[in-house]
C-alpha cells in the first residue's frame, strides 16, 4: 500500500525535515506573546517533499486545478461539542458519562447559546486576531453542540486555518475548565 514505507504499526513514524512556510506565520492570539508557523515535510534522505503529507497532496491538487483554469476556494462550517468539564476532571472520574455544556437542542434559538458565549466568543476573537476570519457562530442541534463558520478562501489556506482553529478552540476551552471535541459522534445518542 503506498505510503506505508513512511509509517506503519511496525515502523512507527520516521523522522522528517520540516521546512517552514513563512506564508503561514501568524499570531497565535489565544496564547500570550506567541506566533505559529506551519511547515512542509521533506525526506531526510534526499530533501524531497513527502508526497503523502496531507498538505502536499492538497497542494498538488490545487496546482492541477489551476492548470485547468480553476481557483479552488472553500468555506468551512466546523461543528464541535462543548463539555462542561475538562478532560482532567473526566479522567478523575474514569471517563464516565461526558457532561455537555447544554442539555437541549439549541439550533435555531436566538438566546440559548448565550450561556456558552464566554468560550465561543473567546474562540471567535482569537481566530479573528490570528488572521482566521470568522463569518458566524451558533448553537447547534445536539446538547452542547456549536458551530463556528470560517470565511471562504483558497483551499490550502483554509486547511491551514483548520489546523489553527482546532488547536485554538481546544486550548481556549481547556483554559476555561471545559472540554471540546470535534468527534462527529462522541456519544451513541448524539450526532
Give the residues covered by each predicted segment.
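Glycine-rich, acidic/polar active-site loops that bind/position phosphate-bearing ligands
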Residues: 1-191
Amino acid at each position: 500500500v503506498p505510503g506505508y514505507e513512511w509509517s506503519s504499526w511496525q515502523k512507527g513514524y520516521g523522522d522528517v525535515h520540516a521546512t517552514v512556510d513563512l506564508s503561514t506565520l501568524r499570531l497565535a492570539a489565544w496564547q500570550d506573546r506567541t506566533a505559529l508557523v506551519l511547515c512542509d515535510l521533506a525526506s531526510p534522505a534526499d530533501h524531497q517533499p513527502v508526497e503523502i503529507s496531507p498538505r502536499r497532496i492538497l497542494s498538488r491538487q490545487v496546482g492541477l486545478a489551476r492548470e485547468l483554469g480553476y481557483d479552488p476556494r472553500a468555506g468551512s462550517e466546523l461543528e464541535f461539542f462543548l463539555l462542561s468539564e475538562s478532560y482532567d476532571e473526566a479522567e478523575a472520574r474514569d471517563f464516565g458519562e461526558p457532561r455537555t455544556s447544554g442539555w437541549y437542542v439549541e439550533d435555531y434559538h436566538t438566546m440559548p447559546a448565550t450561556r456558552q458565549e464566554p468560550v465561543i466568543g473567546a474562540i471567535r476573537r482569537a481566530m479573528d486576531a490570528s488572521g482566521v476570519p470568522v463569518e458566524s457562530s451558533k448553537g447547534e442541534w445536539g446538547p452542547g453542540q456549536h458551530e463556528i463558520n470560517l470565511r471562504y478562501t483558497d483551499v490550502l489556506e483554509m486547511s491551514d486555518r483548520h489546523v489553527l482553529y482546532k488547536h485554538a478552540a481546544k486550548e481556549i476551552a481547556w483554559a476555561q475548565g471545559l472540554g471540546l471535541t470535534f468527534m462527529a459522534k462522541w456519544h451513541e445518542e448524539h450526532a
